[in-house]
Amino acid sequence: MSSTAVTILQASSEQDIAQVKLIFLEYLDFIESYLGESLGFQGTEQEFKTFPQAYDVLYLAKVKGEPAAACGVKPFKPGICELKRLYCRPSGRGHGLGLKLTQNAIRFAKAAGYTQMYLDTDRGLTFANKIYEDLGFTDIERYYDNPMGCSRYMALWL
């Protein structure tokens, strides 16, 4: 892991929110290319029309001042939130950004009074799966209708 200057911040300015949105759109392109399928079933078109309304919080990671990674926390149902769209640009990899962003999201969720955090990921995304496992996420049953067969559903008790 590199010791290059890394900053993790809660995206609140218009500029930071726009940078998170751009990273999220890059994430969708990456995932759709990786899976060879559209994520439209997740309601992404509506999500980005009203962005960032659906999110409780957005986090942005910067490396040497440049936007490199992001994630968000969405309410799912009472007491449960969902970690969404954790993505690190290739230029930002190797700095532990995925771990740092997820840790920030967990701290937020605890402070906000959530008792569980859900997420879904692809089993083939080994680095992401390792982060989640190391942080204590465990496998759960499918919690939404997802037509993709390789999804993994996980939860963390907060």
For every predicted segment, state its role:
Residues 1-5:
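Basic/polar N-terminal segments that are highly enriched at the extreme N-terminus
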Residues 115-118, 122-135, 141-158:
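C-terminal "cap" of GNAT-fold acetyltransferases
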